[in-house]
């Protein structure tokens, strides 16, 4: 039978519920259990696909094409289970499902209410995420309830998990509550009052936490733990300290040493071998003992919020570990870069990366960045839009197509080398179509797709004969211009098998040591254990580029 752990948060948001949930899952997995994670988001958007990265951070894409919360990226990087559409749902998706049922008459004329109809639907979605009744069923499903206890948006979710816990019966569910202990510098002490109040609020709803994860700047003293235990009705060994660390990969060991996994296994009556966290210890050692450092310039438009490029940041760090170097990432605003100042802004970096994005703001700066990298033979990796700007730059300055652009930025440009895809086939064989009037939400080319890779290319040395990666885009290299670009020397090294859409462009080794653009998002498949072949090759190229510069 699948057991459930419900993770809630209090006092403030952004405490790290996603990391805490993923860390607990990783420890339980190391005990030999099959684990999955489910993220419940209280906002009314159907999914985060149309939300601004400034509002929400990165949109993480799964193999089955779901646009999900960035926490699912943490989940995939921490545990072996792959995430799917069912692992993330929102208030919007719940209400959409309830209203569709009401229109079909599934409720037999009853008045549709939050309790029981919405709360029942939430419970069904949770069970679906846990794979109950399917071959994907797990031993433990960890459900992270987004938002903060006390938010009006979270109430239906908290009521739903309370009801589900009751239905599951004793020893089949546990509650973990993440809270915050502020440090008052003037008084020189940690304050427990906000934690007392947030647990009081949770208990009013009918939920008694089994464990409290207390986020603080430093470890929580024992006398404070005793006080928290007394006022929250949580056993003292269930009051667990979560202090700030320099790498998230230290969190599993931190929680294990304070007995969180033992407490959960006892509560859920799970008889397992002891946790083996050796690979996490090795990972932490690798991050703390680099043999060098490389400087990477990431040129984008959402640079004020690093969460907008969370998976790219992590993939670069993973690749650094594979090459035993520390990767120092500098986020540069593409709006500040021009052909005239590109050298001044970019000369000190060992490699340049242009990540994905949407809209025309800052795009000319990205084109200038691609030009600088090409002309100065700096290793360049373009992802999604980064591949498109590299194509536009090459068309303008090498292929002689003056005025080349994307129809996303200029609908009437003279040479639309990048244009809207109107038809493509999904991995399951269904043909999707769209036009300029299609809704923004859910109309992109999404999820895992496979392409053939041309032998003798840089891409082939990285991927082999076939590349399967996740996509999230509406625009694509225009097939009508491929021959002109090839004639001018651009290598189209991977094409999709059915539509012959461009997946990878690159420059020959004789022209540039390492210059590649990919239409897909490789960052979503990077893991701390092996990195990702494309990012690993990129960081190796950065290390190589550093050598002559270091000698000089």
Curated annotation (Swiss-Prot):
Its EC number is 6.3.4.2. L-glutamine binds at residues 357, 385-388, 408, 474. The keyword Transmembrane helix does not apply. Coiled coil: none annotated. CTP binds at residues 13, 151-153, 191-196, 227. Allosterically activated by GTP, when glutamine is the substrate; GTP has no effect on the reaction when ammonia is the substrate. The allosteric effector GTP functions by stabilizing the protein conformation that binds the tetrahedral intermediate(s) formed during glutamine hydrolysis. Inhibited by the product CTP, via allosteric rather than competitive inhibition. UTP binds at residues 13, 191-196, 227. The active site is at residues 384, 521, 523. Residues 1-270 are annotated as: Amidoligase domain. It comes from the Bacteria. Residues 295-548 form the Glutamine amidotransferase type-1 domain. ATP binds at residues 14-19, 71. It catalyses: UTP + L-glutamine + ATP + H2O = CTP + L-glutamate + ADP + phosphate + 2 H(+); L-glutamine + H2O = L-glutamate + NH4(+); UTP + NH4(+) + ATP = CTP + ADP + phosphate + 2 H(+). CTPSs have evolved a hybrid strategy for distinguishing between UTP and CTP. The overlapping regions of the product feedback inhibitory and substrate sites recognize a common feature in both compounds, the triphosphate moiety. To differentiate isosteric substrate and product pyrimidine rings, an additional pocket far from the expected kinase/ligase catalytic site, specifically recognizes the cytosine and ribose portions of the product inhibitor. Catalyzes the ATP-dependent amination of UTP to CTP with either L-glutamine or ammonia as the source of nitrogen. Regulates intracellular CTP levels through interactions with the four ribonucleotide triphosphates. Belongs to the CTP synthase family. Homotetramer. PANTHER family: CTP SYNTHASE, CTP SYNTHASE-RELATED. This is CTP synthase. The lineage of its organism: Bacteria, Pseudomonadati, Pseudomonadota, Betaproteobacteria, Burkholderiales. The gene is pyrG.
